Amino acid sequence: MAYQNFNMDHQWLPFTPNRSFAKDPRIFVAADGMHFTTHDGKQVLDAISSLWCVGAGHNRKPINEAIKKQLDTLDYATAFQASNDKAFRAAEMIAAMAPGDLNKVLFCNSGSEAADTSMKVALAYHRARGEGHRNVFIGREKGYHGVGFGGMSVGGIQIGRASCRERVLVQV
C-alpha cells in the first residue's frame, strides 16, 4: 500500500498488527521535546519516551551537539578485544553510581539486546557456580522486554511471544 510519498509494504513493525496499521497509520515526521509531529501536522505526546529511549526528550540541542562532536572524533569502535576511552569513562561513572559491589558494566546497543544479554549472564553465572539447574525465568503479564528471542520469551505481550516462546525458553 502506498502512503503519501513512500511505500509501507516493506517495513515490518514489531508488536503491531501491520495490516491494520496500514489502513490508519501513525506516521511521525518530526519530534521536539516531549512531542512528535505527525505527517498531517498534529502534535502527539510521547508519554513513554519512545519506549524509554529518549528520557531527556527529543531533539535536545546539548545532546545533539555532544553526539555530533563524538561522531566527528570516533563514530564507533567494537568492544571485541578492543575498546575506547569514552566507554571506559562511562563504565567508571556508572559503576560509581551502582550499589554495593555491582561494579562491572556491559554496554549493549538496545534494550532488546540488554534483556537477552542479561538472561545469558544470569544463566552463565549460575552455571559457573555449579547451579546450572537454575534456569527458570519469571516474566510479567503484559510486560515488554524487547524484540529478541529472550525478551519475547519472558515478555507478556501475546502478539509476539506466541511465535517463539516454546521454541526458545521453555521454562518461563
What are these regions (language model features)?
Residues 1-35, 82, 87:
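Active-site-adjacent loop/helix segments that line or gate small-molecule/cofactor pockets in enzymes
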Residues 14-15, 19, 47-61:
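Glycine-rich phosphate/pyrophosphate-binding beta-alpha loops
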Residues 27-37, 53-69, 80-92:
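A structural motif shared across PLP-dependent enzymes of the aminotransferase-like
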Residues 32, 47-48, 140:
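A secondary-structure boundary/capping signal
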Residues 92-167:
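PLP-dependent aspartate aminotransferase-fold enzymes
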Residues 169-172:
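Cysteine-centered metal-binding/redox modules
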